[in-house]
């Protein structure tokens, strides 16, 4: 398990705990928001190191259109960079190819309906 997965799991656990407590503890909510902001800042710092300027702007546009897909791409980029499997900085052309592969891996299977007439 890599550090990003551990942080993500810990963040989810804290969010679940905060939901259980509800709005009763504003200090815990503030602390959780602060930790989430730190996590986002750290993620953006890593992405700035990994991606070229063009690739970052492409990722920002994707984030506006498909936030969940962009989040998934960010996590995969960070994991690949930590494993040393990415050229740094990542060019826009390489990033486009990587996006195509990620999209192909995650696209839903096409369902076909066949109508047989008698």
Swiss-Prot record:
Record keyword Magnesium present: no
Pfam family, one: dsDNA_bind
Domain of life from the UniProt record: Archaea
InterPro entries for this protein: DNA_bind_arc, PDCD5-like, PDCD5-like_sf
UniProt keywords, alphabetically: DNA-binding
Listed Low complexity bias regions: 24-33
Molecular function as annotated in GO: DNA binding
Annotated stretches, region: Disordered: 1-33
UniProt biased composition (Basic and acidic residues): 1-12
Keyword Plastid recorded: no
GO CC list: cytosol
Family: Belongs to the PDCD5 family.
Name of the molecule in the record: DNA-binding protein MmarC6_0793
